[in-house]
Amino acid sequence: MKIFDTHCHIADPAFDEDRAEVIARFRESGVCRANVVADPCEEEPNQEKVFSLVEKYDFLCASIGAHPHNASRYDAAAERTILEYLNHPKCRLLGEIGLDYHYDLSPREVQKDVFDRQLELAWERRVPVQLHIREAHGDCMDMLRARLAAGRMPSGIMHCYTGSWEAAKVYLDAGLYISLSGALTFKNAPKLQEVCRNVPADRLLIETDCPYMAPVPLRGRRNEPAFITNTLAKAAELREISPERMAEQLYENALRIFGLRDEV
C-alpha cells in the first residue's frame, strides 16, 4: 500500500530532535512520498532548511509560498525567492497561499493582494497551487471566479479542507482537488465527512499538515506523517471501499497533480 502525504511540515522545529526517526516511521507505515512546505515570509524563513531536507531524500518533494499569516512580510525579495525555488527540480507546487480570517495576522486586504499575486505567479509559471482558506470562503470564491472568467486560474489543491460540501463543489468546478487532514476523524466533523463521501474519486487527496491536526485516536499529540493511516482508514470507511483501494486512488491522484511518476 502506497500513501502520499501531500502537505506536511517536517522541517518544523517540532521535529528537530527526532526528524530521522519520524521519517523512518512514516516509511515503515506505508507513506512512500511526502510534500514538505516552505515559506520565505516566516519570521525565520525556512526554505533553505526545507530544500536541504528534500534534496537528501528522493521520496520527498517541496512547495513554497507565502502563508496568509505572513502576507504583511511579502515583498519583492520574497517573490524573487519563491520564483527562484520554483525552478528547483523538487519543487512541485506554489503554496501554501490563501486567506485566513480566523486570526487576521495580516490585514485582509493585504492577504487578498498577496494571494492574488501568487495565483498570478502560479499561472505564469504553470505550476499548481496549494490553498489555505480559513473562514474566508466567500472572498476566495470571488477571487477564483474572477480568475476563471479571465482564463488565468491555475490548477491546484484545497489544502486541509474544512469547509462544506456546497463550497467544495465550487472549488471542484474551479478545477481544484480537495485534500483532507486528520480533522476527518474528529467526532464533530459530519460536514467534512459529507465532503469525503461526495468528492469525485479522482479529485480527493489526504495529508497530515503535521505537526498539527493529529487524527483520532492520536488527537492532542504532535502529528507526524505515519499517523496518516488513521485518516486513510476513515476515508475508506466513509466511501465504503477497502483501505488498499482508497490508498491506490489517492496515490494516483497525488502523482497526477504533483506531476510525478511512480519511481520511489
Give residue ranges: language-model regions.
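Mid-domain alpha/beta scaffold segments of enzyme catalytic cores
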Residues: M1-V264
